[in-house]
Amino acid sequence: MEKSNRRKRPSTPHLSCELCRERKIKCDKVDPCTNCVSAGVVCVPVHRPRLPRGVHARRARPMSPAFVPARAPTPVAGPVSSEEKQADASSGAVGAVDDDLRKRIHRLEAVVNSMRAAMQDPSPAPVSQVSCAYRCIVGGADEEQSVFNNSYPAPTSSLACSSSIPIHVQEQPPFTSHPDCFWTSLVGEVGNVAWANLDWRWDANCFPWVVDQIEDHGGDVGSSSETKSDTHSPLAPNMSKIGDGGLRFLGLSGNNPTLTWTPVLEDKEMTRQLCQIYLQQVDPIIKILHRPTVEKWMLHGERYLDYPERHVAVDALRSAICYAAAASLTDDQCSAIFQRSRSSGIVEDSRRACEAALERSGLLVSPSITGLQAFVLYLIARRSEDRSQAAWTLTAVAVRLAKALGLHRERDETFFSQQMRRRLWLTISLMDLQASFSQASEPLINTEEATSTFCLPQHINDSDMDPTMTHEIPDREGLCDTTFALVTYHIQLAGRALNFGTAASPQHKASQQQHAQRFEQNALRLLHFCDPESSPYAWFTWHGTQCLVSGARLSALRPLQLPQPSNSSSQPPPSPSPSPQEHNHELLRLALNVLEKAHLMHTDPRGEGFRWYVTMPWHALAVAITECSLCPDVARIQSAWPTIEACYQLLRLKGVAGQEEAIQRPLERLMCRARDKASPLLQLARHSPTFSLGSSAATSAAPTPRSRASSAPSDTLSDLSWPTAFSHAHSQLGVDLAPVGPVQPLAKLDLDSLLLQFDIESQPLLAGQIHPVDAEPSLRTWEQLMSDIDHAESNKLLP
């Protein structure tokens, strides 16, 4: 009898740890095991009875262990055979397994209850009330290893949820927070229940990502590395892919587990408002979504395309739209719409929710066009509000995913799919170029590839097509939903050729002129019938195109990366060249046009809705500072310096997107030298209230330069730097492309007269050969600046 009791209550064995089971390697079953120590990961030991095998294995259990009635003991009437003893021992082991499974289910229920309570009560719990689950979330390595041997109930953020957690758990001492251990513990709980072959679809609302995971391969069950995959499943990909990193290695997961779990944007009214903001302030610039489809989906509650209701790609896209909208808000807009400041966390919460949704979508392992659209919106929004290199780094992921989906290849598809694919690919190409400028680095998509894959979408409105359309639609004349987007698609192609040349041959210089002229012609052709006073969007499109034209011409003279000069034997016959003084004056004029337009979009009320996308053009600012410091004309310096000073202060305030020190430090030294050289020429203007030569105050204290940017449509179209970010203009929320004031009929613009002003071939500056490097001090100064930026970037990699 004593032996039978011992047989029924065996000691819980120490099985292979989680990582060894997943990797299918032998575990030495120490705590921690040698394999986990060598791999540098947290060892998660497994303590449970061994599963029955062979004829005694019970793979399918029709009832939950919590509802299996207890079996009455069978009286022993005579001698017990060996078969009966073996069956008795097997039933005892199964009973112990049932008890362990029941406890684990109870702990999972406590996890869900505590999280629901945390969503309802945002007040944080006192540190003394935090449950034992956070013991694995915190502490050092030794503490984590010891805690992993225990059970992991859920964290609680309020006293109200403590009642749902076992008493022995509440009494555990707390630890401080550590990023992702809690989710590791929760995954461990679910993984250890998997051997029971339970179907988690019944509780998909609580665990939408735990589905199609249950595969019993015998032995240490739950160690299967092969899981089911269904790209059209409304639920997320398998948990093993998310648990072992997913997008976390890209830095997308937040450090706060509550934020990564809590659906921040569950408020339908808030989501609706953010969608309206997106349609007004983001969609006119970033044309990767179909506006009518988004309106039907997020504003009217219809399904998105043919996706099921809970598809993770659709959830990721919804979160990305809300994040992009929140990032586009100014402080005044945020206060007026949500009655809270922008710094109160609306952008941060939206970003964390978007990151969590992207992680659940399994973008890296099962990419889709919808998921990639969400990722692109995330990168654009993050670049606008984050000065780190994250957006520049993650742009490479977007490029790879786009190529994996074949977005750069033409194929047989419907007209709607073709248009959306082309828009997405060209937007990613534009992001790649913008990221290269922010880091002063080479783009991932080179000029040859960008040219060979360049297929423009149609110049139409989104309302002209729908997902069921099969026939093509001709281009429209006049301002369309895609006008500014098409301008940026043209500039991303010209920008690569203008700034990342490979040779300084005469053929290269001639092609530089051709690229700049071709872009000007294409851009101006898109502006037929465009009245800049008809709407904020038209205002921005007009002035934005001016800025891009000036920026393209500036890049033809001062590319971001200068080509290496060729040997003397290949030099062409000498041709008339402008003097260095004339050259400097033209460079200064173009750079000032760029800066004035950028400053205008940061200050004019009509640009408020698109200001989030505008970054100060450091490339044009560096050229202007260099040329102004070498210019002997006092009147020209006095006219240019207020613009330079105001833009420099704005750059210091806003920062350079993606690279703060590597560009700003050399630029600051260049600015100091320019101030020292220009100050003797500006003694009379030093005390003028118009500007302050040595001011280092914020932008509000900086001078407001005289702007030529707000003039009539007959102005010269040469005022915006394509190397900077671009922006549209919606003046106020709630006015969707509405006229700002009374609009008079505008006749068709005289395109020939506008193009005549930009006839590059008629200008000796661009028609002639660029002056030799040794004869031009400004070029040497520019080369020194680019060398300093490259040196600063290299030093960032050193310890």
From Swiss-Prot:
InterPro entries: Sec_Metabolite_Reg (IPR050613), Transcription_factor_dom_fun (IPR007219), Zn2-C6_fun-type_DNA-bd_sf (IPR036864), Zn2Cys6_DnaBD (IPR001138). GO terms for biological process: DNA-templated transcription. The gene is nscR. One of its GO terms (molecular function) is DNA binding. PANTHER family: UNCHARACTERIZED TRANSCRIPTIONAL REGULATORY PROTEIN, ZN(II)2CYS6 TRANSCRIPTION FACTOR (EUROFUNG). It is found in: Nucleus. Coiled coil: none annotated. Residues 67-95, 218-237, 561-583, 692-716 are annotated as: Disordered. Disulfide bonds: none annotated. Keywords: DNA-binding, Metal-binding, Nucleus, Transcription, Transcription regulation, Zinc. This is C6 finger domain transcription factor nscR. Residues 561-570, 695-714 have a biased composition (Low complexity).
